[in-house]
Design a protein with these regions (language model features):
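Hydrophobic transmembrane alpha-helices
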Residues: 1-21
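Membrane-embedded alpha-helical hairpins and interfacial helices in multi-pass inner-membrane proteins
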Residues: 4, 24-138
Length: 138
């Protein structure tokens, strides 16, 4: 669910910092509670992937297809698939290119659902609801 928030930079530039900080804190808490088995690797590379994806998402915010920022939903899918897929392949194996593709594919599927099935409707609802839109003014 939280991955749907990776599209919030479409609405306001400050969301780049927000989603990046949220990712960092979640990864940090996950390490300390034992929930994040990738550990420091994910704190550094996962957060960097989120920042990169958020910046790209912001850059593509005005590219629309039938009013939806479809292009802006692509960077979180691709960047997280590559980075988190590599983390998972390194940590759990198999440490082969095929292993990486398998891990990256799994991450991409989850990201596709989060960004396209949840994130795009979330952006649409915020943009169409005056009370919500007021929270996301530039």
């Amino acid at each position: 669910m939280s991955e749907a928030f990776t599209l919030l930079p479409v609405l306001v530039p400050d969301a780049v910092v927000g989603v990046t900080l949220g990712c960092f804190l979640t990864n940090l808490v996950g390490v300390f509670t034992g929930a994040n088995v990738l550990g420091a690797l994910d704190i550094v590379f996962g957060t960097a992937a989120t920042l990169t994806a958020a910046l790209c998402t912001r850059r593509l915010a005005r590219v629309r297809l039938r009013g939806l920022p479809v292009a802006a939903a692509v960077p979180p899918v691709l960047i997280n698939a590559v980075v988190v897929g590599a983390e998972l392949a390194w940590a759990f194996g198999p440490r082969t290119f095929a292993g990486f593709l398998l891990q990256a594919g799994g991450v991409a599927l989850g990201q596709l659902f989060s960004c396209f099935a949840l994130g795009l409707p979330l952006v649409r609802i915020i943009e169409k609801t005056p009370a919500l839109r007021a929270w996301f003014r530039d």
